[in-house]
């Protein structure tokens, strides 16, 4: 028995503003049913002694100390700029 109906697929497609044909709705129904069946297999797993986790991997942020360093020289920064004036990038005006 299918766990999702063609009407449900058409309804979700309508909510998503997707125009699908009857053939596409039938194809998506079969695909979604297979996905749901596969996902339901997870209910068969014994998770009794498995602690809840928020991440599968034990991840930690490894931070380094901020060390101030000199920036690039102004000439180096502006050398690839298409246009500059008074040590600043010059860009076309966007407001009138």
Curated annotation (Swiss-Prot):
Gene that this sequence comes from: gatC
UniProt function note: Allows the formation of correctly charged Asn-tRNA(Asn) or Gln-tRNA(Gln) through the transamidation of misacylated Asp-tRNA(Asn) or Glu-tRNA(Gln) in organisms which lack either or both of asparaginyl-tRNA or glutaminyl-tRNA synthetases. The reaction takes place in the presence of glutamine and ATP through an activated phospho-Asp-tRNA(Asn) or phospho-Glu-tRNA(Gln).
Protein name: Aspartyl/glutamyl-tRNA(Asn/Gln) amidotransferase subunit C
UniProt organism field: Geobacillus sp. (strain WCH70)
GO molecular function: asparaginyl-tRNA synthase (glutamine-hydrolyzing) activity; ATP binding; glutaminyl-tRNA synthase (glutamine-hydrolyzing) activity
Family: Belongs to the GatC family.
GO biological process terms held by the UniProt record: glutaminyl-tRNAGln biosynthesis via transamidation; regulation of translational fidelity; translation
Catalytic reaction(s) noted: L-glutamyl-tRNA(Gln) + L-glutamine + ATP + H2O = L-glutaminyl-tRNA(Gln) + L-glutamate + ADP + phosphate + H(+); L-aspartyl-tRNA(Asn) + L-glutamine + ATP + H2O = L-asparaginyl-tRNA(Asn) + L-glutamate + ADP + phosphate + 2 H(+)
Subunit and partners: Heterotrimer of A, B and C subunits.
EC number: 6.3.5.-
InterPro entries recorded: Asp/Glu-ADT_sf_sub_c, GatC
């Amino acid at each position: 028995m299918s766990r999702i109906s063609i009407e449900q697929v058409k309804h979700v497609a309508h909510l998503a503003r997707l125009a699908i044909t009857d053939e596409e709705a039938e194809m998506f129904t079969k695909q979604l049913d297979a996905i749901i069946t596969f996902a339901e297999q997870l209910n068969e797993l014994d998770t009794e002694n498995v602690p809840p986790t928020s991440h599968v991997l034990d991840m930690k942020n490894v931070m380094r100390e901020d060390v101030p360093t000199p920036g690039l020289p102004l000439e180096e920064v502006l050398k690839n700029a298409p246009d500059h004036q008074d040590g600043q990038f010059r860009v076309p005006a966007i407001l009138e």
